[in-house]
Amino acid sequence: DNKVIENPYKGLEIVDGHAVKAPEDYQDPKMLYEALIKRIRKYHPSTDISMVEKAFNIAYHAHEGQFRKSGEAYIIHPLWVGIILADLELDKETIVAGILHDVVEDTVMTEQEITEIFGSEVALLVDGVTKLGQLSYSADKLEVQAENLRKMFLAMAKDIRVILIKLADRLHNMRTLQFMRPEKQIEKARETMDIYAPIAQRLGISRIKTELDDLSLKYSQPEVFYDLVQQINARKTEREEFVQQIVEEVSEHMKNAKIKAEVKGRVKHFFSIYKKMVNQDKTVDQIYDLFAVRIIVESVKDCYAALGVIHEMYTPIPGRFKDYIAMPKPNMYQSLHTTLMSSVGQPFEIQIRTEEMHKTAEYGIAAHWKYKESNDGKKSVAAQEEEKLSWLRQILEWQQDTDNREFLSLLKGDLDLFAEDAVSYTHLRAHET
């Protein structure tokens, strides 16, 4: 079952020569709620959804008469936050807290009432999100940025799920940013680029991080974004045909080598293409690995076997092989990366990973907050998952001993917190129009 092209521009429509993400039209809350339940049932068929239903009914009535800038009923937003969390396959307490995340701040409902109805676990999550509240943001003030990050990390230390709810909240707000004033759009986009996207990156949640990046670029530099969309779409058909051919060739060779593999092709996301253009001072046509082919196999042994097959099929480009299986990234990411030259002289990248590695790459730390029921029915997070957050403990130690400037410097330096993006984001800011 080889899905050929995964298009990151899905949902983008060309309007007046520009690509725009179609907004979620005025939606019926009941239909949205049904979509949420369907998603939860998909990954946890036996769960009792009565708590989710109760949260929906309470939030629905608590937010009655409240509307967003789009004119939509306010309840649409918390429901989408719940859906984003369900897409990460999180536990129902997190989803319930996502649905209720604005009720204490924006309605007459109290934290005490949430505790009485849903228990202390949900109440603490809602309280954590409420306390983070509206972070005060200024792109030019290091002090403010450091203070925001301190708040975020302290919330994470108490319960990582608070940050997952906050990321889902920000993602839906970014998806509906077109209803804000232009200056507010730029401010939110920069804040997302400086704070939320790097945290999603550090937690390894690529499916949220890549969308936050693309939306940040769209609103902070619309001309650059739309120009890039048009340039990429101009040669879309020939690129898709090229990727299709690679996928078919690779699938055939994997079959012959008796390696069970799922092979997918995709065009890279706008922001990662733009980042390469800026950092390498190149045009779109000069970026040679615009597309990647992903091979998902059953075991680590198969990863290396698949690599051997690939290197026999195509010419590897020297210095472009990375073994993130033997040396995982700090955010737990594992894969083999190799860049190759096709028979027609077109370079492309292949990533090889197991299904478990793929889930960690997509969901990051959220992958370890799936339903883990022990015999007594209580969720448990294994000690090894705690170890994977040792970097967070390191941050908390620094928090106590450093001033804001030093704290930021440590985050961006020794800890490698924003390793992949820190320089790029600063560099990109210099290119803003």
Model-derived features: where do they sit?
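Active-site helical microenvironments for divalent-metal-assisted chemistry
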Residues: 1-292, 296-348, 353-412, 424
